[in-house]
Amino acid sequence: MSLKPPVSEKDHLQGDKNAPIELVEYGDYQCPHCGRAYPIIKSIQKKLGNKLKFVFRNFPLAESHPDAVNAAIATEAAAVQGKFWEMHDAVFEHQRDLSDAALIKCAQKVGLDISKFESDFDKQEIQDKVESDLESGVRSGVNGTPSFFINGKKYNDSWDEDTLLEYLRSISV
């Protein structure tokens, strides 16, 4: 399966936008597997440096993870203030409690204007961004989280750090 749509300016991107390796994760902030993948991706980003661009797309599995949608909306609301990645990290680092009160604490921790955050949280376009990510995942063949795409193609191998890093290094040569 291929990534639909391809990465664009609408995505949240870390790293060099012209990097030779593009890693896209469809993730759910409440998913324990995504929680385990989070430090692995951070480590891989450090090891590959400017050879890697990383994109995160929301894929909340609401039936299994009742707080996942609100957590995704919270990160998108933080993006309005230019703090998507800070909120992304804070939410994963506090994954055990994603209640509304906990999300407000995360927003405070990353220095958001809380009244603006709360206002943006309720905006339809923020909810639409989460829904758009989810729909793109469905079109791309995502059926669980985390799901990874490397240079536009679905990655189906193990995502333990050694295996994923070895694969990424093999394609960057």
For each feature predicted by the language model, list its residue ranges.
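C-terminal cap of thioredoxin/glutaredoxin-like
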Residues: 26, 33-46, 105-173
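A short beta-strand-turn-helix
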Residues: 4-21
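Residue-level preference for short coil/turn positions at secondary-structure junctions
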Residues: 17-19, 50, 144
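N-terminal targeting signals for export/organelle localization
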Residues: 1-5, 170-173
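Residue-level signal for pocket-adjacent positions within structured domains
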Residues: 2, 7-9, 116, 150
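Short clusters of hydrophobic/aromatic residues that line enzyme substrate/ligand-binding pockets
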Residues: 13-14, 98, 155
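Structural alpha/beta surface segment adjacent to cysteine/selenocysteine redox centers
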Residues: 24, 29-109, 169
